[in-house]
Amino acid sequence: KNGGKPVKIAMAFEQDAFSQDVRLGILDAAKRTGSKIIIDDKLPKELNDMAATLSKVKATNPDVLVVSGHTKGALTAVRQISEMKVDVKMLAMTHCDAAALSKQHGKASEYALCASQWHKSLSYTDNFFKDGTTYDADFTKAFGYAPPYQAAESSAALLVFKDAFERAQSFDTKKVRDALAATDMQTFYGNIKFAEGGQNVSKPMVLFQVSCNDDGSKCE
């Protein structure tokens, strides 16, 4: 909500399972907060033009614009928002990190609010990778680029298996599975604890906002 008042929401989503899950979450949040969906658009398959949606945004002035179209959709959205001079109070997106949004579009991407699984600045620690900042530095030194969240979660998965094997004291499938199910630990990536369905219910998503220095030469 905006100062305790319901907000007007515009949204545009790709038609894949992930983006549609995000859409359902927005619909649920709108219902809970009494907010109103004023634009509910499908992104084109090519993800190369969302001018039609942005024209509606300019005409209706929503409080929030939510876009989920993976890497290409994120890049297209920021490019066309800048080109069409769309002024929206809040821009919320997925896949900002995968799109390297701040590097690709610089100042044009400033203030975009991004959902992510992980960020190097989080305070989680472990005894192997230490913390996010250390992991980021070590990964970048080894591979020549900053780690995406997929690399971080894969590294954390190795720690989970290591811990499970040590507790199981066996390679027996059932014993290892039972050990995995009983996992309750912290890694540099976040806390790990599984629900009955196998989902990690202990680590929340994070939000970060793209910010730039005064002249726009550096954004992150």
Predicted regions and their residues:
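Phosphate- and divalent-cation-binding pockets in alpha/beta enzyme and binding domains
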Residues: 21, 76, 100-101, 160
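Residue-level signal for short, function-critical loop segments
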Residues: 13-16, 118, 164, 213
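Extracellular/periplasmic Venus flytrap/periplasmic-binding protein
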Residues: 1-85, 125-130, 153
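Segments of small-molecule ligand-sensing domains
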Residues: 138-151, 160-219
